[in-house]
A protein has these predicted regions:
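An acidic, gly/pro-interrupted, aromatic-rich
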Residues: 1-133, 138, 142, 167, ...
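Extended, well-ordered alpha-helical scaffold/bundle regions in very large, multi-domain proteins
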Residues: 142-148
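Amphipathic alpha-helical segments that form the core helices of the histone-fold
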Residues: 149-160
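Acidic/polar, glycine-enriched structural segments that form the non-catalytic walls/loops
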Residues: 159-163, 171
Length: 173
């Protein structure tokens, strides 16, 4: 589909397929990662943001802390409306900013790491079987033969790159 999920569901889905999503209802709100100094221009009163530690930050987006005029950057990148006014329909943009959030936001990096740990931890499977399981978990379908070949080539390229640059692998982990 050319239409993507709403901002909150993008986050929840990434956490769910990785096994990190905490589904327990809570009292209060959850504070996921946020860039340092993001609230520095917020006045009346000035505020400091402290992200939750541990599983609390992986609760569903419906429990996320929202500051009315300073929408969480991940939500903003995926066109979530601010709480300043009601909207009947969300805008849908297609910008590189959303892709950059998926690649760099600590929540998504941790979700990718957790998913990779689960897939790689399944003993007795070769790369093709792992790719098939990954597709089923993330896309709810099996991979086409061309997709398997593409991912296998990408995997070989990544392995070679990290073998030559172990500091990059260490930084990612």
């Amino acid at each position: 589909s050319r239409f993507r999920l709403d901002a909150e569901i993008v986050r929840d889905n990434a956490l769910a397929v990785s096994g990190l999503l905490m589904r327990d209802p809570i009292v209060g709100h959850s504070r996921p990662y946020q860039p340092a100094g993001y609230y520095r221009h917020l006045n009346f009163p000035t505020r400091r943001y402290a992200a939750d530690k541990g599983p609390a930050q992986y609760r569903r987006a419906v429990y996320m802390h929202w500051q009315r005029q300073f929408l969480h950057p991940m939500l903003k990148a995926f066109d979530a409306p601010s709480r300043e006014e009601c909207t009947a329909q969300r805008p849908e943009s297609n910008t590189p900013l959303a892709a950059l959030v998926l690649m760099n936001d600590p929540t998504f990096v941790e979700a990718a790491r957790a998913l990779a740990t689960t897939i790689l931890g399944a003993e007795g499977r070769d790369d093709k079987q792992r790719i098939e399981e990954l597709f089923l978990r993330v896309l709810s379908r099996g991979p086409r033969p061309v997709e398997i070949q593409t991912v296998l080539q990408f995997l070989a390229d990544c392995r070679e790159n990290y073998k030559q640059n172990p500091e990059l692998a260490a930084r990612l982990l």
